[in-house]
A protein has these predicted regions:
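Non-catalytic pre-domain segments flanking phosphatase-related domains
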Residues: 1-10, 32, 36
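Conserved acidic, metal-coordinating active-site core of Asp-based
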Residues: 102-175
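Solvent-exposed alpha-helices and their adjacent loops that cap or buttress functional pockets
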Residues: 1, 61-62, 148-150
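Asp-based phosphoryl-transfer active-site loop
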Residues: 4-21, 43, 99
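Short, solvent-exposed loop/turn segments at secondary-structure boundaries
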Residues: 20-23, 90
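Short alpha-helical
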Residues: 22, 50-51, 163-164
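Active-site phosphate-binding/coordination module
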Residues: 27-126
Length: 175
């Protein structure tokens, strides 16, 4: 057979998981069987790896079958069996003030991740709360986002009402 599958890359939300963000028993069993037959599984997502993807990787036993996690929209690739970070592409720290300015002048919240925390100046923001819930993370309020983010980061996210995005885009491209 010329079409032997060796690698299966799966997005999480709406692909691997159902609307409740769960892996069904049928899907889990099918993917474990595929791994037993030599198929490598990669879970790919914009989510952070620790809380956002790890529980799903563990359900699928990626550590036992040498699977991988591709987190932060490709910003980090981890061999889930060894824990080795195989690839890491961090956000250029010089772009952070620009992103922060775009977010604040458009009244959007900006977030990043630090271990089990979502860091933000706006812990009560509806979209920040959704991001934390999706990734099973706690929210840590910071007084000043730029002062708080002194560590290298793989991703930051600007969140807000989708209908306001066109005005956000105009403001940021004119900066």
């Amino acid at each position: 057979n010329l079409w032997i599958i060796k690698l299966l890359v799966l997005d999480l939300d709406g692909t691997l998981t159902n609307p409740k963000k769960e892996i069904t028993e049928h899907t889990k069993n099918t993917l474990i069987k595929a791994q037993q037959q030599g198929v490598k599984i990669v879970l790919a997502s914009g989510r952070p790896d620790l809380n956002g993807i790890a529980p799903l990787a563990n359900q699928l036993q990626l550590d036992e079958y040498e699977g991988y996690i591709l987190s932060y929209n490709g910003g980090e690739i981890i061999d889930w069996k060894t824990g080795e970070i195989m690839y890491k592409n961090l956000l250029d720290p010089e772009v952070l003030p620009y992103l922060y300015e775009c977010a604040t002048k458009s009244q959007f919240a900006i977030v990043t991740y630090d271990g089990e925390y979502v860091l933000t100046e706006y812990p009560e923001d509806e979209y920040v709360l959704k991001e934390a819930l999706l990734n099973v993370m706690k929210i840590k309020k910071v007084d000043n986002f730029l002062d708080a983010v002194k560590h290298p980061i793989a991703k930051c996210l600007i969140v807000g009402e989708p209908t306001a995005w066109p005005s956000w885009k105009r403001r940021c491209t004119s900066t």
